[in-house]
Regions:
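Beta-strand-rich ligand-recognition modules
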Residues: 106, 123-173
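A flexible loop/linker signature enriched in serine peptidases of the S9 family
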Residues: 207, 226-238, 251-252, 270-280, ...
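Blade-terminus and WD-like Trp-Asp/Gly-His loop motifs, strongest in beta-propeller folds
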Residues: 213-221, 257-267, 301-309, 367-376, ...
């Protein structure tokens, strides 16, 4: 799109195809689901007369909100606006009519359903009103009015369930109409049985997603972990187990807490039993389970490479701030849990003895083991209010046999992570550009480098020599890297404008290669630490979220392992997204992305929203945040997202 074509974006009156100027208007078409026969229950106690079973209760069990059928058909009304339904030859039948209501602007009004038959009205899957008794003819009592309030371009799913009776005196019929309040009489709206709805905040927050994957150390199997959100308070989680060679799911209901033992392809999980935990191993491919240890002090385990011991956190509550006057030792001390601490414990499986590894001072974090488990990295960060960047980080190497410690790094700022090389002689450290003075800084004339521009450094343990590996590499490293023991290369995610791909760094020559991942925004990835054939990952874009992939690293081909939200999102009418760059007055090229409204008409003008995140990280392609452009575009805005970072 060039600069001239951008003129279509300025504010002008809006219209929606198929919408009409608002007034009381009846639905002319609905989707009719296949009829379902129902029967009265066996009634055995007349003492319940005050709570006698009513006809409308037959409709309550026929929700049908999620019915999936190819047999539904579109029904049209007669000249009076009624949908004529068939009277059953015998007994009673539930007829279900479905439509949608969508306004261009905010609207209030009443959904009115009229029928002499018994019926129930549902809006967005929730019962909003019903008529409990049949009439011999349509009267004033045959009308049920449901108040409706809708945001602009918000779709309301309407379902009317009608109980038809072979013994009824009249032929069943139903009328569905919407009457706006007088102050909203100029708002356009549609009342049609659309197959697709426009994107809503619930499409962003709800639904099933693959949230992470975990590959076995030998690369033969992948755990995929899922979450499905139903509401703010309701969700479910589950896991599956997939064989990488065949792509076959060999366990569709894997224990949700299952993880990998440090080598091979043995699964483990813990079971709480009283005040302690049992350790259960699952052998593959047989999937037979065995309890291999009991009496463990925790279920949250960080395994050593040889599985002879594990490390876990011990929580130590800090002193509580009480009284009306508070003395804060630092800005961070304003946070309620700032004085709480988490220290590290070591549990030896052969002796069943738990030994403290750290205690006192700042909270300590484990940062991984060398290949044989004889050494461990521990990180501690503390506040330093007297000088920028206001935090200091110590990286300490611990000899797990003698408890001797060696402080490898005393850094200014946040040292995000560190990982051992396969031979244990080097580390790959991720942190800000100023972590080691000016070694990682590439900020031109700016006096302070962007701390969010995370860099990668090679650190030689014996000599303490630091080599910046990504100073001239534009993307910023994200998350924890993986130093693969099979090919000797380092894998990491990186922010690259709107995208978050995965890169592979060869520490021998410093070359960096982008992997051809299929997702625009990779949320996480997993590689077996002793193989280099497969990589699993999850990702999202503007039109999908929570997909799980398996990549063959030899061919670069990715296959979709799971896309649980595909069916639900197929019912969403997304707006088209396209890149749009321009050159600023100082000559800087500004990267940008444009999202057009669904059903965009290039001959019309639209209001424009420019979204510019003022932080130091770029905006990313995805639909799992509150400022997703699809949400604004669904309200008939053109959305332009700047990425000047």
């Amino acid at each position: 799109m060039n600069k001239t074509s951008l003129s279509i974006l300025f504010l002008a009156p809006l219209t929606v195809a198929g919408a009409a100027i608002a007034a009381s208007r009846h639905a002319e078409r609905v989707e009719a689901l296949p009829p379902v026969k129902v029967q009265m229950p066996i009634v055995g106690d007349t003492a319940l007369a005050p709570h006698r079973f009513s006809d409308v209760q037959l409709l309550e069990g026929a929700s049908r909100r999620h019915v999936k059928t190819t047999r539904s058909q579109i029904e049209t009304t007669d000249t009076a606006g009624y949908f004529k339904l068939s009277k059953p030859a015998s007994g009673r039948v539930v007829e279900t009519l479905v439509t949608t209501l969508r306004p261009e602007r905010f609207i209030k009004g009443s959904l009115k359903v009229t029928s002499a038959s018994v019926f129930e009205v549902m809006v967005d899957g929730v019962s909003k009103g019903s008529k409990a008794k049949p009439d011999s003819a349509v009267t004033a009592s045959s009308v049920v009015a449901v108040p409706i309030e809708l945001e602009p371009e918000r779709t309301a799913d309407i379902m009317v369930k009608v109980l038809t009776d072979s013994e009824a005196k009249n032929d069943p019929a139903v009328k569905i109409e919407f009457e706006p309040e007088s102050k909203y009489s100029d708002v356009n709206y549609s009342l049609v049985p659309e197959k697709k709805h426009r994107f809503s905040i619930y499409d962003m927050s709800d639904g099933p997603r693959a949230r992470s994957t975990s590959m076995s150390p030998d690369g033969k199997y992948v755990i995929t972990r899922f979450v499905e959100v139903f509401s703010e308070k309701e969700q479910r989680t589950w896991s599956t187990l997939t064989e990488t060679k065949t792509g076959k799911i060999i366990n569709a209901s894997l224990n949700g807490s299952a993880g990998w033992m440090p080598s091979g392809s043995t699964l483990y999980y813990t079971v709480k039993r009283g005040d302690s935990y049992d350790l259960v191993n699952i052998s593959l491919p047989s999937q037979s389970s065995e309890t291999v240890a009991t009496g463990l002090p925790t279920g949250d385990i960080i395994w050593s490479p040889d599985a002879s011991y594990f490390v876990y956190y011990k929580y130590v509550p800090g002193t509580r701030k009480e009284g009306i006057m508070q003395r804060y030792s630092s800005p961070d001390d304003r946070m309620p849990e700032n004085r709480d601490r988490y220290y590290l414990m070591k549990y030896d499986l052969s002796t069943s003895v738990a030994q403290p590894l750290t205690y006192g001072g700042a909270t300590t974090y484990p940062d991984g083991f060398n290949a044989d488990g004889s050494k461990m990295l521990i990180k501690a960060m503390r506040e330093n209010t007297s000088e920028y960047p206001f935090y200091k980080t110590d990286l300490i190497q611990v000899d797990m046999k003698t408890m001797a410690v060696d402080t490898l790094v005393k850094a200014n700022g946040d040292l995000s992570s560190a990982v051992y090389s396969p031979d244990g002689k080097s580390l790959f450290i991720v942190g800000g550009p100023s972590l080691f003075g000016k070694l990682g800084v590439n900020a031109g004339d700016h006096p302070i480098a962007n701390d969010f521009d995370s860099q990668g450094y090679l650190f030689d343990i014996a000599s303490k020599k630091v080599t910046p590996m990504t100073r001239d590499f534009d993307p910023a490293i994200q998350g924890e890297p993986v130093w693969n023991a099979s090919d000797g290369k380092i894998y990491f995610r990186a922010e690259e404008g709107f995208f978050v791909p995965v890169y592979c760094l060869n520490p021998a020559d410093g070359s960096i290669k982008k992997l051809p991942v299929a997702a625009d925004n990779v949320a996480n990835f997993s590689i077996g630490n002793r193989e280099d054939r497969y990589m699993s990952y999850t990702g999202q874009a503007y039109e999908y979220a929570g997909r799980a992939y398996l990549m063959d690293l030899k061919t670069g081909k990715s296959t979709v392992m799971a896309d649980p939200d595909a069916e639900r999102l197929a019912e969403v009418n997304f707006g088209k997204t396209q890149p749009w760059k321009f050159t600023a007055s100082d000559g800087t090229e500004i990267d940008g992305m444009m999202c057009l409204p669904p059903d965009f008409d290039p001959n019309k003008k639209y209001p424009l929203i420019v979204y510019y995140y003022g932080g130091t990280s770029p905006s990313q392609r995805g639909m799992s945040h509150a400022y997703i452009p699809q949400l604004f575009a669904s309200r008939d805005y053109v959305v332009y997202i700047l990425n000047p970072s």
